[in-house]
């Protein structure tokens, strides 16, 4: 077994790289634009490209990226989300219920799923962040959400480059 690394990523076919990038962020526009910046000299070049593309992504493409993220506390439908939200699964039922209630309030207020880099955070921490962010105005929240998506993408890209290959 070997680690994929940036060299291995660059050697993959365009289709394979596109598929992997889409697993990181479910915006086809983001994945295509990141891919267009390759081959990458090192992991930092990939991370920088991913961050720049996200910053320039139109809101419609950003909304498409959110479709790949389950609600915090809901059953994750992909391995990345499940791993990132692992500490929520063991939370007290009352905390999970409050998360569900505030998730719905967030979606009603802002029109999209509450997105936060959940990796390593407890359900209680995520609930406190959600409660705080419900007080944001829509423009501020959009910026915060975009920043959180960037953190998630970076975490997933790092994990992608570190995964073992056959």
Outline where the language-model segments fall.
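Substrate/cofactor-recognition hotspot
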Residues: 109
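GST superfamily/GST-like fold recognition
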Residues: 121-122
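Long, amphipathic alpha-helical surface segments
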Residues: 126-166
């Amino acid at each position: 077994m070997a680690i994929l690394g940036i060299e291995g990523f660059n050697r993959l076919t365009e289709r394979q790289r596109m598929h992997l990038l889409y697993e990181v962020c479910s915006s086809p526009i983001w994945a295509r634009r990141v891919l267009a910046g390759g081959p990458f000299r090192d992991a930092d070049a990939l991370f920088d490209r991913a961050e720049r593309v996200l910053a320039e992504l139109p809101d419609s493409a950003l909304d498409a990226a959110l479709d790949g993220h389950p609600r915090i506390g809901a059953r994750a439908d992909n391995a990345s989300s499940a791993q990132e939200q692992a500490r929520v699964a063991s939370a007290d039922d009352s905390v999970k219920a409050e998360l569900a209630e505030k998730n719905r309030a967030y979606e009603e207020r802002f029109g999209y799923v509450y997105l936060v880099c959940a990796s390593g955070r407890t359900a209680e921490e995520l609930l406190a962040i959600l409660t705080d962010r419900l007080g944001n105005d829509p423009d501020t929240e959009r910026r915060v959400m975009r920043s959180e998506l960037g953190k998630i993408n970076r975490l997933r890209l790092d994990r992608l480059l570190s995964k073992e290959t056959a």
